[in-house]
Design a protein with these regions (language model features):
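Short acidic beta-strand-loop surface patches of small beta-rich interaction domains
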Residues: 12-14, 44-66
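Short amphipathic, charge-patterned alpha-helical segments
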Residues: 23-43
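Loop/turn positions that initiate beta-strands
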Residues: 73-76
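Short structural boundary motif marking the start of a folded domain
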Residues: 1-6
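Short, contiguous acidic and Ser/Thr-rich linear segments
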Residues: 11-29
Length: 79
């Protein structure tokens, strides 16, 4: 299923992205897509950790978005 999420890159570039993608992607794949879209020069930190802001939970990069409970409308901050 496709979900629409907001990706917060304030720890890197200060930009915010709205993306539509599959909930079967891993968190690492989400980061790869965000990096390709914004062409950020810094690489993401080891572990590819993210925080789902509206659920106040942290997740590592190897989990899928479904495993993290990410749904349409969530805001994801890249740590």
């Amino acid at each position: 299923m496709y979900i629409e999420v907001t990706v917060d890159l304030t720890n890197y570039e200060g930009t915010v992205l709205d993306l539509r993608l599959s909930d079967r992607y891993t968190v690492k794949k989400l980061l790869d897509i965000a990096w390709q879209t914004t062409t950020i020069s810094r690489s993401p930190r080891e572990g590819h950790w993210v925080r789902v802001v509206n659920k106040n939970k942290l997740f590592p990069g190897h989990l899928t978005l479904t495993d993290c409970g990410v749904t349409t409308g969530d805001r994801i901050e890249i740590i």
